[in-house]
Amino acid sequence: MKAIGFKSSFQLDEGNCFEEFNFDIPHPSGHELLVKVQSISVNPVDTKQRTMPVDKAPRVLGFDAVGVIEKIGDQVSMFQEGDVVFYSGSPNQNGSNEEYQLIEEYLVAKAPTNLKSEQAASLPLTGLTAYETLFDVFGISKEPSENKGKSLLIINGAGGVGSIATQIAKFYGLKVITTASREDTIKWSVNMGADVVLNHKKDLSQQFKDNHIEGVDYIFCTFDTDMYYEMMVNLVKPRGHIATIVAFNSQQDLNLLKSKSVTFTHEFMFSRPLHHTDDVIKHHEYLKDITEKVEQGYYQPTTTKVIDGLDVDSLYEAHQILESHSMIGKLVINLK
């Protein structure tokens, strides 16, 4: 089978160091599924992983995937051959930038039947990240009426995570405030369901006042935590929650959180599969809920760009686009 990977980490300005490899098709065992990959989504985590040291070469990236189950392990109980599934995988295994992939069943759910594979591929990683942040970190209720009066600020509402997080938060009853700056990103964020869209290139505190917003219960940062850290501390309500998916690049003063008793959390969606936590089945459960909501018409996919064919050039192009920070929604590559 064909796989696209690299032997050592590289920056894009070094040229295209992706290579095509030919591997034997693996055989599933235990709770593993063998999936014939149809579509993948490329995420910022792919570009970051590409620049990190390679422990075992070649390194095959890729997290989001949609595909058909070809074979199942002898302990699989939730799926059967022929099921169309989607998932986001784990960094400690070969990724989805290959024709066939082994994946454990508790990280997988059946894909929405009303979506094409290139649409469904936009949802697993960002959807899981949003679900974990909203339910596990912020602790919002799964009963929308109980979230009435609660508010959420999403930094970078038009990105992949922000786009699906807006839809999920709106479904579960939160008032959603997002940030965007370009006309197209503002329009996109509104279409995703944002109640208020603020310009992150202008003073957010003043815009809160202009929109009669006294503070928010939750802040979800999906872009440049260092830039927004002090601002988020100022905008969150006392005893509120701040979560980020972007690591600090410089030292920040956690004591700023003290006077308001603010909870600050680094959300890393892969922590469950990486550490084999007892509740790793939540990935399956959250993806299953996403499928149900999509099929019922409550969530929409966030794919905005599709590249046909997985090869070294198309993958390099995808990484270039993501590193330009110009994407709205998600970028998907079709293998079929």
UniProtKB/Swiss-Prot annotation:
PROSITE patterns: QOR_ZETA_CRYSTAL (PS01162). CDD domains: AL_MDR. GO terms for molecular function: oxidoreductase activity; zinc ion binding. It holds the Pfam family ADH_N. The keyword Cytoplasm does not apply. Signal peptide: none annotated. Keywords: Metal-binding, Oxidoreductase, Zinc. Belongs to the zinc-containing alcohol dehydrogenase family. Quinone oxidoreductase subfamily. PANTHER family: ALCOHOL DEHYDROGENASE RELATED, RETICULON-4-INTERACTING PROTEIN 1, MITOCHONDRIAL. This is Zinc-type alcohol dehydrogenase-like protein SERP1785.
